[in-house]
């Protein structure tokens, strides 16, 4: 669960076989069966069909803040990640271990439990493949009693 006073991070390494004709989402979202185009709350990376542009989405109650984070390429591994810094209250966004932007926490989902989620959807009548290498997520602990 996102909390404004605690650090939070997410990082993944993956690839998709067709960067243009696919949609994908990967990140932390509420439990939902429609991760790509139906989630209402989360902090996740998204790419829409027909484009190679990716963005970090910070969404609460269907209101989004987005941060552009570069482009995807066919069948090429990439790392995407973010770190939420409670000191400046911003999400610091990274692609291939290089900082590409920051986003404010205005629409951070602070009233929902979030789960690691990912999905791919084809954008044409052909199978699309997402290959996940790893996903890592964590949250700052501030007391010995926290798990």
What are these regions (language model features)?
Residues 58-79:
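Short, aromatic/His-centered strand-loop micro-motif at the edge of beta-sheets
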Residues 1-54:
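Secretory/extracellular carbohydrate-interaction modules
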Residues 94-98:
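Short strand-turn-strand beta-turns centered on an Asx-Gly dipeptide
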Residues 136-147:
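Extended recognition patches within non-cytosolic domains
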Residues 14-16, 30, 84-86, 120-122:
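Short beta-strand segments enriched in hydrophobic/aromatic residues
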Residues 104-133:
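Flexible glycan-contacting loops in extracellular carbohydrate-active proteins
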């Amino acid at each position: 669960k996102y909390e404004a006073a605690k650090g939070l991070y997410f990082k993944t390494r993956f690839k998709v076989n067709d960067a243009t004709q696919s949609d994908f989402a990967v990140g932390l979202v509420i439990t939902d069966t429609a991760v790509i185009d139906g989630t209402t709350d989360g902090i996740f990376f998204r790419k829409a069909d027909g484009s190679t542009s990716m963005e970090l989405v910070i969404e609460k109650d269907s209101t989004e803040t987005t941060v552009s984070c570069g482009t995807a390429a066919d069948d090429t591994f990439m790392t995407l990640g973010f770190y939420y810094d409670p000191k400046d209250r911003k999400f610091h966004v990274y692609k291939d271990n290089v900082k590409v932007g920051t986003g404010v926490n205005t629409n951070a989902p602070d009233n929902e439990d979030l789960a690691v989620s990912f999905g791919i959807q084809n954008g044409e009548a052909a199978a699309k493949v997402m290959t996940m290498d790893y996903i890592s997520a964590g949250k700052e602990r501030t007391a010995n009693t926290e798990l």
